[in-house]
Curated annotation (Swiss-Prot):
HAMAP family assigned: FabH
Gene: fabH
Protein name: Beta-ketoacyl-[acyl-carrier-protein] synthase III
GO cellular component: cytoplasm
Catalytic activity: malonyl-[ACP] + acetyl-CoA + H(+) = 3-oxobutanoyl-[ACP] + CO2 + CoA
Organism: Burkholderia pseudomallei (strain 1106a)
Region (ACP-binding): 257-261
Protein EC: 2.3.1.180
Main localization category: cytoplasm
Amino acid sequence: MAQSTLYSRVLGTGSYLPPDRVTNQELADRLAKDGIETSDEWIVARTGIRARHFAASDVTTSDLALVAAQRAIEAADVDPQSIDLIIVATSTPDFVFPSTACLLQNKLGIKNGGAAFDVQAVCSGFAYALATADSFIRTGQHRTALVIGAETFSRILDFKDRTTCVLFGDGAGAVVLSASEEPGILGSALHADGSYSNILCTPGNVNRGVIAGSAFLHMDGQAVFKLAVNVLEKVAVEALSKAELASEQVDWLIPHQANIRIMTSTCRKLGLPQERMIVTVDEHGNTSAASIPLALDVAVRDGRIKRGQHVLIEGVGGGFTWGASVFRF
């Protein structure tokens, strides 16, 4: 008797934004106290961002991940003890180690000895984590996975650099995946090119208990934009090819919410109408690895994304990394 094909299927989604919502004008007023000039008009025109959320000083990445995870688990209607794989995509972990995933496993009270680890691919992190969990489930090594993107990027922002500090925010998004004979994730593609590591990075490193060099995010905006618009269309087409789908069969595009100009450019290159693109960058800013699952949860909960529809996600981030997945919700 032939063995049936296993897929990983999205059972539920969840997200969380810290309550401190900071508008462009509020941020501009804060920066003005240090002699840094910016404005709502300047930020909106270049990025599409109108507001972002910042975590309180005593709130960690795992705290944000916990709420998003609880909401995803509730939506999926699964027993937390059945979750035998936890993957957290983050570039702002609570500690160098242990992993944020292990901390989250403990906070959720999961005691089954399942695997838990972090994935670090910056803004591509959720695409990397989702594809990794899908592979584990397809091979039968795990049956139920919790995949999270969570960030406290406000901790690594230089608020004297107006070209970067206005872009990013904090938040978390989560999905629960489960083994299924019904198709869920249909195709994924992941790539990296380390020769571009210097265009988006934190130059400092930990050396004998202190940070050697700058601990703040550095970005060559023009180089990132040029590379992003070049690779995002290609990786999306690659994932669609693996899924044996044409772009016109995509119901919803969820790009990494970095910059509205990059997002609309990719949508246009794929031949998709703009109304099929989920946009949250205006209210969330760039939440790095959290941006895709945050946008996914928003669109699921407001009723736009419905069961049976095809969803294409894609991300690009430091490393340089990029990736995409397409799934039937």
